[in-house]
């Protein structure tokens, strides 16, 4: 009964209104408000502040600054293996495997279209036909910045408007095409092993998504917005392996896509396995 009520609420609640309200609260600078929020969150999720660059929780100007906090330089070492594909974030592997018939596995009985995930872009979807994917759910208690799995040059960024369902096991198993229905930011890169997509998927109370090259992405609502990065439009953006790509103002999910025969996932990398940013999750085939 509890699960049914939760799922019913997912369909009835005003997703965007709640997320905007959460965003305003998370940016509040009133000391007693933001300190209460930060302390309650840190206590509930047992956040380890010893790894943070600023260890005192109340030193952050607002909750979002705390949530997207930087870590000490040695807190997330990068796997030095040549060709290693790095985990883009702290969290857990939700699913990983092959892209079959243009679809990505979501949960038992559910999958979603790569083309829909990428905002209906047929050409981009074709480049991942027969490829591989990994879905990483960001853990609330850990680090909330997203980093590059491989070095790459940004080719295109696509903002796809949509719903803001919560992202968890229950919704993954019960909301068809969850990740292709939620609002998301698609980042398409050229890498040494071919095309790579890094898709930042929003969720309920995820107030915004930010990238290091464009800041907070706030396109017109209800419209798919595309940015090309080449000499004719925006300057090319080159990011090294392990470099910060962006961050969630509150967390959600990152989906990685690679082309056919381009990656081999690490043995023993099981669904729900815990990850740290910078750990190797696979090996690239150049």
UniProtKB/Swiss-Prot annotation:
Needs which cofactor? pyruvate
- List the GO cellular component terms: plasma membrane
Task: Please name the catalytic residues of this protein.
Answer: 90 (charge relay system), 147 (charge relay system), 252 (charge relay system), 252 (schiff-base intermediate with substrate)
Q: How is the cofactor bound?
A: Binds 1 pyruvoyl group covalently per subunit.
Q: What is the topology of this protein in the membrane according to its UniProt annotation?
A: Peripheral membrane protein
Keywords, A to Z, come to: Cell membrane, Decarboxylase, Lipid biosynthesis, Lipid metabolism, Lyase, Membrane, Phospholipid biosynthesis, Phospholipid metabolism, Pyruvate, Zymogen
Subunit text: Heterodimer of a large membrane-associated beta subunit and a small pyruvoyl-containing alpha subunit.
Family listed: Belongs to the phosphatidylserine decarboxylase family. PSD-B subfamily. Prokaryotic type I sub-subfamily.
Record-given protein name = Phosphatidylserine decarboxylase proenzyme
The record lists the organism as Azotobacter vinelandii (strain DJ / ATCC BAA-1303)
Write the gene name. Answer: psd
């Amino acid at each position: 009964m509890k699960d049914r009520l939760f799922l019913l609420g997912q369909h009835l609640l005003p997703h965007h209104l709640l997320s905007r309200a959460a965003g305003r609260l998370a940016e509040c600078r009133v000391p007693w408000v933001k300190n209460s929020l930060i302390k309650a969150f840190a206590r509930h999720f047992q956040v380890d502040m010893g790894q943070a660059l600023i260890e005192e929780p109340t030193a952050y100007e607002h909750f979002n600054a705390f949530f997207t906090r930087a870590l000490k330089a040695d807190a997330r070492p990068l796997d030095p293996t040549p060709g290693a594909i790095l985990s883009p974030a702290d969290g857990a592997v939700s699913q990983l495997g092959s892209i079959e018939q243009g679809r990505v596995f979501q949960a038992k009985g559910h999958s979603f279209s790569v083309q829909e995930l990428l905002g209906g872009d047929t050409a981009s979807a074709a480049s991942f036909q027969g490829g591989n994917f990994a879905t990483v759910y960001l853990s609330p208690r850990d680090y909330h910045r997203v980093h590059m799995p491989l070095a790459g040059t940004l080719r295109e960024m696509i903002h796809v408007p949509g719903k803001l369902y919560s992202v968890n096991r229950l919704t993954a198993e019960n909301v068809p095409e969850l990740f292709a229905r939620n609002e998301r930011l698609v980042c398409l890169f050229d890498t040494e092993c071919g095309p790579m997509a890094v898709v930042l998927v929003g969720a309920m109370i995820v107030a915004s998504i930010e990238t290091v090259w464009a800041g907070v992405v706030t396109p017109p609502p209800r419209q798919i917005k595309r940015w090309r990065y080449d000499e004719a439009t925006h300057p090319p953006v080159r990011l090294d392996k392990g470099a910060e790509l962006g961050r969630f103002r509150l967390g959600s999910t990152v989906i990685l896509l690679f082309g056919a025969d381009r990656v081999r996932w690490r043995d023993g990398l099981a669904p729900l396995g815990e990850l740290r940013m910078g750990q190797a999750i696979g090996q690239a085939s150049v």
